Amino acid sequence: MAAVQQKHDWADDDELEETSTELPPPQKITNKDGSTTIIEYRLNDNGQKVKTTRRIRYITHREVVNPRVAERKSWTKFGLSVKDGAGPAPDTTSVGENIIFKPSFNWRQEAKDESKDPNAQAMKDKLKDKKVKCRICNGEHFTARCPYKDTMAPIGEAGAAADVAASAADEAAAASQGAAGAGKKGSYVPPALRGAGGAAAAGERMGGKYGERDDLATLRVTNVSEMAEEQELRDMFERFGRVTRVFLAKDRDTGLAKGFAFISFADRSDAVKACAKMDGFGFRHLILRVEFAKKAA
C-alpha cells in the first residue's frame, strides 16, 4: 500500500519565519591568556540581528593598607547615616587631598649648620629678653605676620596724622579763600562762611551739642570676626548703656568686616563699664580687644 503523502500547509511557513527572529543566547568564552570573550546578539531599529563581541581582561590590584584603617572602614554607621552604604558619603564627608610627607635625609646636618651660625646665635641672644609686639593690633607677634595687616592701619601711624593735618590745612585754605571772596561785591559766599568779617562759622558736629561727649565715650574694638554684623555688636554693648553709634569697617569688594569697629555711648560711665567687661570677651571664636578710641589731633 502506498504511503499517504502529506500536503504542505502554508501556516507552517509563518511559524518558521517567526522562530527565525529569535536571538541566540549570549556566549561567554574563557581564553587561554586569562581574558574572557562575551558574544551577545541584539536587534537594531531595522529589525536586523547585530552580533557584539567583547573581550574583557580582569586584573586584580592588591594594596597593603593599615589594618586599623581597614577596621574603621568596616564600622557600622549610626545616626542619620545608618542607612548609608559603605564608604564616605558625599553629603556628609569631604575627602581631603592626600599629602605625602617626605622627610629630608640630611636634616640633622642642616640643624647643626644652623646652630653653628654666629649671626643667628647673636640675634637669639639679642632678642632673648625682648617681647614681640605688633604695631597694628598690639598682639604678641610680628607685624609682618599680623592677620589684619591688609585691613587695618597701624595704631598711631604717622600717615594717619599726616592725613588729618592735610585735611585741616585744606579746610583752612578754603576758609581763607571764602573770606577773601566775601569782600568782593556781588560774589557768592557759601552759608558756612557767612558771618562777621567773613569768618567761617562752626558747623554742626555729629551728636549736636553732645559732640565732645560722644568723642570721650567712644570705644575702639579690634580683633573682630570677618563675619560680624553691626547689629550683633550693638546688641552686645547695649547691655551697658545707650549706644548712639556703631561703626563696623567693612571691605568694599567682599563686604566682610575688616577686623575693627567703633562703639559710641551716650554716657562715658557706660563706656567705662563696657570697656572693663568686654575687653577679652570671646566673640565668634576670637578674643575682642576693647579700649577707648584716641581722639584725633
UniProtKB/Swiss-Prot annotation:
State if Protein biosynthesis is listed as a keyword: yes
Annotated source species: Neurospora crassa (strain ATCC 24698 / 74-OR23-1A / CBS 708.71 / DSM 1257 / FGSC 987)
Its primary localisation, in coarse terms, equals cytoplasm
Q: Which HAMAP family match?
A: eIF3g
Q: Which family does the record assign?
A: Belongs to the eIF-3 subunit G family.
Q: Which GO terms describe its cellular component?
A: eukaryotic 43S preinitiation complex; eukaryotic 48S preinitiation complex; eukaryotic translation initiation factor 3 complex, eIF3e; eukaryotic translation initiation factor 3 complex, eIF3m
PROSITE patterns, alphabetically?
RRM (PS50102)
Q: What is this protein called?
A: Eukaryotic translation initiation factor 3 subunit G
A single Gene Ontology molecular function, please?
translation initiation factor activity
Its subunit composition reads:
Component of the eukaryotic translation initiation factor 3 (eIF-3) complex.
* Tree of life domain: Eukaryota
The UniProt keywords, alphabetically, are: Cytoplasm, Initiation factor, Protein biosynthesis, RNA-binding
User: Compositionally biased, Acidic residues: which spans?
Assistant: 11-20
| Record's subcellular location | Cytoplasm
Gene3D superfamilies for this protein: 3.30.70.330
The GO annotation for biological process reads:
formation of cytoplasmic translation initiation complex
Biased composition regions of type Basic and acidic residues, renumbered to the chain: 1-10
- Stretches assigned to the RRM domain: 217-295
Q: What does this protein do?
A: RNA-binding component of the eukaryotic translation initiation factor 3 (eIF-3) complex, which is involved in protein synthesis of a specialized repertoire of mRNAs and, together with other initiation factors, stimulates binding of mRNA and methionyl-tRNAi to the 40S ribosome. The eIF-3 complex specifically targets and initiates translation of a subset of mRNAs involved in cell proliferation. This subunit can bind 18S rRNA.
State the residue spans of region: Disordered: 1-35
